[in-house]
Amino acid sequence: MSSAICPCGSGDLLLACCGRYHAGQPAPGAEKLMRSRYSAYVLGLTDYLVQTTLPVQQGGLDREAIAQWSAQSTWLGLEVESSEVFGGKPEHAFVTFTARWHDGNGEHSHRERSSFVQNQGRWYFIDSTVPLKAGRNDACPCGSEQKFKKCCSAYVE
């Protein structure tokens, strides 16, 4: 495994690339986190996928479905189109990418613009399939101690 190339498409060795984030080192930015999440799908690292999702959304994830999809797919590649980081406290970002895979139903391509937020030195994926239960004037679910309308609401599509 020490000589394995990272599945994220960087061309670097896994241990020097996404493997260090899988081992617990915080990803330094949203794009690195997104690439490490793609690699986690390739490698079947369901726990990592859950742990790097916004903590208030983790309970709404279907771990079994994630693991099954990961295992039943042959991952064909990742292309990052853009990465936009927005300043502020906390920092937010969008990463636009296309992931390709093959499964029992053929070859697939999925293009997505994902949202991310940084909290306490860690970046988290904001999963659009798990609703954030917050009113505009409620505390933001990301833990920033700001109102939702002043924090993550603009980054949830």
Curated annotation (Swiss-Prot):
Signal peptide: none annotated. Pfam families: SEC-C, YchJ_M-like. SUPFAM superfamilies: NTF2-like, Sec-C motif. It comes from the Bacteria. InterPro entries: NTF2-like_dom_sf, SEC_C_motif, UPF0225, YchJ-like_M. Belongs to the UPF0225 family. This is UPF0225 protein Psyr_3863. It comes from Pseudomonas syringae pv. syringae (strain B728a).
